[in-house]
Each structure stands twice: as structure tokens, then as C-alpha cells.
UniProtKB/Swiss-Prot annotation:
Family, per entry: Belongs to the guanylate kinase family.
Reactions performed catalytically: GMP + ATP = GDP + ADP
Residue span, Guanylate kinase-like domain: 18-196
Superkingdom field: Bacteria
Name of this protein: Guanylate kinase
GO molecular function ontology, one term from the record: ATP binding
Classification via NCBIfam families: guanyl_kin
Amino acid sequence: MKDKVSFPFSPDRPLCVPKLFTISAPAGAGKTTLVRMLAEEFPDSFQKTVSLTTRSPRPEEVHGVDYYFVSQEEFLKRLDSGDFLEWVALFGEYYGTSRLEIDKIWKSGKHAIAVIDVEGALALRSKIPTVTIFISAPSLEELERRLKHRGSEQDAQRQERLQHSLIEQAASSKFEYVIINDDLEKSYEILKSIFIAEEHRNVL
């Protein structure tokens, strides 16, 4: 039987049970920007989980904010200790979500938002009641344009990510909500309405 993780009740918001939201999307679909907008507007309600990864940080990324950047040795050590609720090897690097990270956010009375890949989101849902959201780019051509504009991958890496995006897009039907991000402000309003509705959903 898989481990189950129960929600703590928030003393500051007694009618609200902290939830876990997962947001998944192909690279370049806009998930990071949308989550940042949500956290900035609702800092007392939502907090993004910080995953661990063995990959090198991009120029704009900050340790402890975007990811915890760790060595492969440290990652595998924490994996062996059972620290991860989910983990995945992707593009030759490891990524994982710590159970302690989610618990810390819940105990603060906030909802946790995990920005993770499709496989990780579905793995989390098998262990924890999870609201799953998929962000899609309007087309593969637009996704490729955004990846080129980001400029953080070589051509071969970009093509690999595009192929992986097709696989992730095919899995979008397994998610409760799907948002096509063809307009950032419109997509944010849709995302915000989902979070507000879920926060007020009764736990029966």
C-alpha cells in the first residue's frame, strides 16, 4: 500500500484545509510566470514548493527559490532515506519533491503549489489528494518559438524538449483542469478562478 499523507488544519483559517495543487506544462508554456503572478497576488494563501534537482541553475535562477540545487550524491542519499514523495529522472538529471517541503507549507496555513512534470504530478496524486492543472501552449510552433526566445538550450536540447512536450501534451486528459495559455492575462484569470473555487470547496 502506498503511503498516504493527511492534511493538517490551519489554526488561523479553521474552515480551510490546506490543499496541494500541481501545475504541469511543457517547457515554455508559461507555468512559472503564472504561478509567480498568483503567489504575488495571494502571498498569504499560496506558496510554491521548492523541488530539489541535480541540474545546474540557469542564469536567472536562485537556490532555495526556484530549486534546491544539489549534487547527485546528496539527491540519491535523500532518495534512499524516503524523503521524496515523487521523483523523476529527466534529460539526464534528477528532480524530486520533498514531503517535508509540503508539510512545512501546510503547517503555515497555506496551500502548496508544486510546479512539476506530468509524471510527478500523477505520482503525487496517487499519494495525496491533489488538484491537478495542466498549462498548454496554443501550438507546438508557439512552444518552439518560446523555447528559442528563452535561449537556455542548444538546438539538440530544444528538440528533445519539444519531443517530450508532445508526450506531456498527450497526458493532459488525465488532469482535472487544462488551460491553453494563448493570452497571459486571460490565462491568469482562469487559473485564479480555479484556485479560489477550490479553496472554497467543501471537504465531504
